Amino acid sequence: ISVSAFLLNRSSDLRFCPEISVASTKAYTTQLVAGLLFAVYLGQLNGKLDAALAKEILIGIHELPELIHTIFEVDEDMKAFAKHYGFKTDAFFLGRSIDYAVAMEGALKLKEISYIHAEAYAGGELKHGTLALIEEGVPVIALATQEDVFDKMISNIREVKAREAVVIGIGMKGDEEIAKHVDH
């Protein structure tokens, strides 16, 4: 909600600061956290989530602001990357499973902020026409954070690299494997 005076904001149980941008990142993040909190509640209510795991999840939520802050520390490599690829007119995001939802949000944010044409595609659908859109030098942001589909995502990365895309990989902290397959 962009303006705190809106009826929806006044009637909501969630209170977050007004969004001061086109890309509604606070609202998106708040929705994710609210959904996670609800899932924890339901998991405990029906006995499918033990107290130890629930506590671990809640601690993780509490640590989110600090983690997000470290992600956005801009270093020289990121600045150089932005200068080199910021002029591109197209970008593609790839993800599987939960990463596909994040890829869709990433594409939306890139469109909203930079006015660069950006689309997100499910990795499993890559061969169904999407691959034809990939051409030399086009940036492809590949999300590979889900262990159960990691190998399939690496296969997708190889496919777009074969078409000479520039692949930016996003993986889990400490994941050395994805770095072997991406350009950045």
What are these regions (language model features)?
Residues 1-11:
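Short, small-residue-biased leader/transition segments that mark boundaries at the very start
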Residues 12-139:
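Active-site phosphate/pyrophosphate-binding segments
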Residues 12-15, 178-184:
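Active-site regions of enzymes building and remodeling cell-envelope glycoconjugates
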Residues 84-87, 133-136, 161-164, 177-181:
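A structural signal for short secondary-structure junctions
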Residues 96, 145, 172:
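Cofactor-binding loop segments of dinucleotide-utilizing enzymes, especially the Rossmann-like FAD-
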Residues 105-113, 155-162, 184:
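Short, solvent-exposed amphipathic alpha-helical segments in soluble enzyme
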Residues 125-159:
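Glycine-rich, anion-gripping cofactor-binding loops and their flanking helix/strand elements
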Residues 169-177:
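Short, polar loop motifs at secondary-structure junctions
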